[in-house]
A protein has these predicted regions:
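Acidic, low-complexity intrinsically disordered regions
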Residues: 1-233
Length: 233
């Protein structure tokens, strides 16, 4: 697509950020392996979304958290250049989600407003209740994120893993009752839900729709496989 003067229209950046729980409980029942498989599988879908959208340049970042938040992919990276390095869960690691959200908010502060970027898309995956061994509560971290312009306008989706996932906190992170909150109870569900959430978030962020639910459509059915993670906790 080009403008009237014959110059190509520049793609606007769409920052796509995964916030991933790598706490000790992710070692149970093959959860961390399933999470790695899910991210590996979702990347080709995101590349397809990027190729199909002439208006957005999809830039990926990944933030992992356990006892502390650490960037796995810190620099905004075009999706076709992302090569996934498998995550390792932290044995006996806590779930410092509040600290992770503060780290995320700090990164969003650095976005260049001159580019008129699309709202960021943020997908949070966690299997536990937020801890605060760093002294930062979930509520404090979330408020820091929402006080940030980009954090407040971001398309925020969340996915719980297993029965111990704190769905109340994940719902607060989403902030919109019309946006589906999903819980995966086995590896198959985790892959399918992350693929759905990633495709939905990238579409909504780059093609804003006014109205309840942000126009992202219905999630996949939850009757996939046996609920092994709800049995394990």
């Amino acid at each position: 697509m080009s403008d009237r003067l014959g110059g190509a229209l520049a793609r606007k950046p769409l920052h796509f950020i995964f916030v991933l729980d790598v706490s000790g409980s992710m070692l149970r029942g093959g959860r961390i392996q399933a999470l790695n498989n899910a991210i590996t599988e979702v990347l080709p879908h995101l590349r397809d979304e990027a190729r199909a959208n002439p208006h957005a340049e999809l830039l990926v970042r990944v933030l992992a958290f356990a006892n502390e938040a650490k960037w796995v992919i810190e620099d905004p990276t075009p999706v076709d250049r992302v090569h996934w390095q498998r995550l390792e869960a932290v044995p006996r690691g806590f779930t410092e989600l509040g600290s992770a959200l503060q780290t995320l908010a700090g990164a969003l502060d650095d976005l260049d407003e001159s580019h008129s970027a699309f709202p960021p898309a943020i997908i949070l995956v966690s299997d536990g209740r937020p801890t605060q061994s760093t002294g930062v509560s979930f509520a404090e971290g979330l408020q820091t994120l929402l006080n940030n312009k980009w954090g407040a306008t971001a398309v925020r989706l969340a996915l719980g893993v297993g029965r111990d996932a704190d769905m109340h906190s994940l719902r607060r992170f989403i902030g919109d009752e019309d946006v589906p909150l999903l819980r995966a109870d086995n590896p198959e569900q985790l892959v399918e839900y992350i693929v759905w959430a990633s495709k939905a978030a990238s579409k909504v962020a780059s093609r804003p729709v006014v109205g309840p639910g942000s126009g992202m459509g219905a999630p996949p059915p939850n009757a996939i496989g046996d609920p092994i993670w709800s049995t394990l906790g």
